[in-house]
């Protein structure tokens, strides 16, 4: 993957426009989870250290496009950055007709979704963004799968368009896991629906030596083996698809499960064989024997790609399966890459972040990359690198 990297450029005195992913949860004007800002900080600090005139922007939430809405302002992000940086930081609300930035200063440009035409990759808006800078840095892997004015359009018109350190690291890590993985390669795909992950399952079935399924997805595979899944979340119309995948790839289907009669945090868990699930029960986690089987597979892996929990880990009674799998990944000597919101929440819950080789910041972008789809922002950077 050939792109210009920000780390290869001399940014001194240059106007640098960084498109970061600062889309963080905010409550009462305060950032409640700073993971994405922390991930973006090294890029911002590097540009400032080089003496660049630094602008950074992002989307935040889903405001009505083209309208300012205080609820979706980047002000809480600015206040967070002021605490973390020794450099001056200020928020600029109206910037499309130009903005003055001093060397060593950080200017945060207000939420890009307040600009009409952002989501449609409007050419006029893209050119206005490009006119603000000498160097455009795309560093938001989480939005690289969307062709929008601040992630894609600007890069076509800026003097220089490059990949920031965070984006470059994402592409390197995913490339390492998917293009030439050390084997055996094990992929874990959890989540509630086969339909939303079908292309991912299909792509990984061709790459992985073993494909582990979890959550509602696993229930569809359990049904495909002829077992009754009771009231469990599963997709009857995709049972044949699950049967097909079972013939093309090595997929260990759970042999025992934890069930409950209601979907509730306080519902007691009953451990039983998949042969014994009753009509009024729902499967909410894999059982101990199944979890240990997966742990053994993961122990011998050389590459692990993890997307999604294997049970409803948010409920303490149905956490054990995901915890065993998570700890097996953490203890493995394999190159491990994890992505997706629920996966990151599980990593935080079990405190294993420092034991995962690479944690992806992208949700949809992570999945689309795994599917083998072209990410518009990355394609644009590759195109610009040729010129």
Curated annotation (Swiss-Prot):
Monomer. The lineage of its organism: Bacteria, Pseudomonadati, Pseudomonadota, Gammaproteobacteria, Enterobacterales. Its main location: cytoplasm. Substrate binds at residues 21-23, 36, 59-62, 113, 146. It comes from Escherichia coli O157:H7. This is Phosphoglycerate kinase. The modification N6-acetyllysine is found at residue 84. Keywords: Acetylation, ATP-binding, Cytoplasm, Glycolysis, Kinase, Nucleotide-binding, Transferase. It catalyses: (2R)-3-phosphoglycerate + ATP = (2R)-3-phospho-glyceroyl phosphate + ADP. Its EC number is 2.7.2.3.
């Amino acid at each position: 993957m050939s792109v210009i990297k920000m780390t290869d450029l001399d940014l001194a005195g240059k106007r640098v426009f960084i498109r970061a992913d600062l889309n963080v949860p905010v409550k009462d004007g305060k950032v409640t989870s700073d993971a994405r800002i922390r991930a973006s900080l090294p890029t911002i600090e590097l540009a400032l250290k080089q003496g660049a005139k630094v602008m950074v922007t992002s989307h935040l939430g889903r405001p009505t496009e083209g309208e300012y809405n205080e609820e979706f302002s980047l002000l809480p992000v600015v206040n967070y950055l002021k605490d973390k940086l020794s450099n001056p930081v200020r928020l600029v609300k109206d910037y499309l007709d130009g903005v003055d930035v001093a060397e060593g200063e950080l200017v945060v440009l207000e939420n890009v979704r307040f600009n009409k035409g952002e989501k449609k990759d409007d050419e006029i808006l893209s050119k206005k963004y490009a006119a603000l800078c000498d160097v455009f840095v795309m560093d938001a892997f989480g939005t690289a799968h969307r062709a929008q004015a601040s992630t894609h359009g600007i890069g076509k018109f800026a003097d220089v368009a490059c990949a920031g350190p965070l984006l470059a690291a994402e592409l390197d890590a995913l490339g390492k896991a998917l293009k030439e993985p050390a084997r055996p390669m094990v992929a874990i795909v959890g989540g509630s629906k086969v339909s939303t992950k079908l292309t991912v399952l299909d792509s990984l079935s061709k790459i992985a030596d073993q494909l582990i399924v979890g959550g509602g997805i696993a229930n569809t595979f359990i049904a495909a083996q002829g077992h009754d899944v009771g009231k469990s979340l599963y997709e009857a119309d995709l049972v044949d698809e699950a049967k097909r995948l079972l013939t093309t790839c090595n997929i260990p289907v759970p042999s025992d499960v934890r069930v409950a009669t209601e979907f509730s945090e306080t519902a007691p868990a009953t451990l039983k064989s998949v042969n014994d699930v009753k009509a009024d029960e729902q499967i909410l986690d894999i059982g101990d024997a199944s979890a240990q089987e997966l742990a053994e597979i993961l122990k011998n892996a050389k590459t692990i790609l993890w997307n999604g929990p294997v049970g409803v880990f948010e409920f303490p009674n149905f956490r054990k399966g995901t915890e065993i799998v998570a700890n097996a990944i953490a203890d493995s000597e394999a190159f491990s890459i994890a992505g997706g919101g629920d996966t990151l929440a599980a990593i935080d819950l079990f405190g294993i972040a420092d034991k995962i080789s690479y944690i992806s910041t992208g949700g949809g972008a992570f999945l689309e990359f795994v599917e083998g789809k072209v990410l518009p922002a990355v394609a644009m950077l590759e195109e610009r690198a040729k010129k």
